[in-house]
Design a protein with these regions (language model features):
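Amphipathic alpha-helical scaffolding segments comprising HEAT/armadillo-like alpha-solenoid repeats
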Residues: 69-82, 102-114, 133-145, 164-177, ...
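Solenoidal tandem-repeat scaffolds enriched in leucines and small polar residues
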Residues: 148-217, 222
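Membrane-proximal soluble helical/coiled-coil segments
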Residues: 49-151, 157-159
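Membrane-proximal helical linkers
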Residues: 20-65
Length: 327
């Protein structure tokens, strides 16, 4: 029995020594890994690890690593997956190329926007967004329309990620608003609001009177997000009289962003709006307009309407809190 226990102990010790040696060799190999070695990366695991490290690198270093990774056999195998017969492999390849940053695959990704499998189309949209493929914006918009997923924020983020560079393409699509679905117009306006640039503000102002309430909401939101313009303030002031409370609420918010003090009188009148969110955004807008807005809120503390008093007190408290934190 003692002999058996001794043998088991020896076997366990040998196993531990082997594992220790293997881990030590692996760590030494990783420590020796340099940028030049990346061009010979055969292991998919190493490739994925390199991709995950890219966000932490300086832009110049990240670009150099990407260029070398594109030449590796492992990357070429992944890129070949864009033409694989399996939809899951094509979708996985789309995810990979978006992270790799190889713009040479943009034409193939555009083709995949028409793939029979919806999952492949979604991943192709996301990959094109990561590659900042501005030239593919019309194709991306058509693909989202085909999927009927303008409410899918993940897909909209593909356009938003491109930043102001995609504004001309978005503007061209909005210019054809008569031929676009309400869902597409709403989605494109949301993108415009997030990137903060509109190539044709006059068209946005026109859409603020669209028959579809949600389009009016998004158009008015855009007017508060782009370069301030007195004409935008006029449109937002008019929107304060909209029959639908969401439009009035966003109009008040945009007036606050525009810092248009001409709106103070109209905002004071809207402090008693029957809709809570209108009152909330009105008070926030007034608080953003400096001392004149704060004075109007202090006056509202003595209003006969308890809802007006409550919202004024809330806005003044939040402003004092923000100023205290800033100090």
């Amino acid at each position: 029995m003692l002999l058996v226990l001794t043998a088991l102990a020896a076997l366990l010790l040998a196993t531990l020594l082997v594992f220790n040696w293997w881990h030590r060799r692996r760590d030494e190999r990783l420590a020796r890994l340099s940028l030049d070695d990346l061009t010979h990366a055969e292991s998919r695991l190493e490739l994925v690890a390199c991709l995950e490290a890219l966000p932490g690198l300086h832009a110049t270093e990240a670009a150099r690593v990407r260029d070398m990774l594109c030449l590796s056999p492992a990357a070429r195998r992944e890129l070949a997956g864009l033409r694989h017969g399996s939809a899951s492999r094509r979708a996985e390849a789309c995810r990979f190329v978006g992270r790799l940053g190889d713009t040479a695959v943009v034409p193939r990704l555009v083709e995949l926007l028409c793939d029979q499998d919806p999952a492949v189309r979604r991943e192709a949209i996301r990959a094109l967004g990561e590659l900042r493929a501005v030239e593919a914006v019309p194709d991306i918009a058509d693909a989202i329309e085909g999927l009927k997923e303008w409410s899918n924020l993940v897909l909209l983020m593909a356009l938003i990620r491109m930043g102001p560079a995609c504004a001309p393409a978005i503007g061209a699509l909005l210019a054809e608003h008569g031929a676009r679905s309400p869902a597409m117009l709403k989605g494109l306006l949301q993108v415009t609001s997030r990137i903060g640039v509109a190539t044709d503000p006059a068209m946005i102002r026109a859409l603020a009177s669209h028959e579809d309430m949600e389009i009016r909401v998004e158009a008015v939101r855009v007017l508060g997000a782009i370069e301030p313009d007195p004409r935008s303030g006029d449109v937002c002031l008019a929107a304060m009289d909209d029959a639908e409370w969401p439009v009035r609420a966003i109009a008040a918010s945009s007036l606050g962003r525009l810092r248009d003090e001409r709106a103070l009188a109209r905002l004071r009148g809207a402090m008693g709006d029957p809709a809570y969110w209108v009152r909330h955004h009105v008070a926030e807008a007034m608080a953003s307009m400096g001392e004149a807005g704060s004075e109007s809120l202090r006056d509202a503390l003595h209003a006969a309407n308890p809802f007006v008093r409550d919202m004024a007190a809330q806005a003044l408290f939040m402003r004092a809190l923000a100023e205290g934190e800033a100090a």
